[in-house]
């Protein structure tokens, strides 16, 4: 895992923030940001649902949203930041997420452990997270790569 601070120039970071928080950007509701509705019944009761919003700007095989052009540059920045060969990697998905703050007495440090994009788990890949704000705390990464009875926090 690598953490890259100041990944974007400030002016570009501000532009992305303003687009995502404008009243023109289309967000779509998710009952739970960690699992699909079909998988929710498999989640232990102590991990309550974490609602949020999403917008998938690009998904391999599904096409582009009208906002794809506003986010497509991320791929090139990532390739450069990770020093990868551009012709050896391809883009699988660009997904914007907006998680809501969690206000519960039993608030955990993390949500249900999950894989962000299960379709990509069969091949070597990178998952890159870019935070526009800090509305719901840090992302937690676990040592375990398979479903487990107990999870160990890696980061």
Please annotate each region the language model reported.
Residues 1-88:
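Non-heme Fe(II)/2-oxoglutarate
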Residues 61-155:
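Catalytic core of non-heme Fe(II) oxygenases with the double-stranded beta-helix
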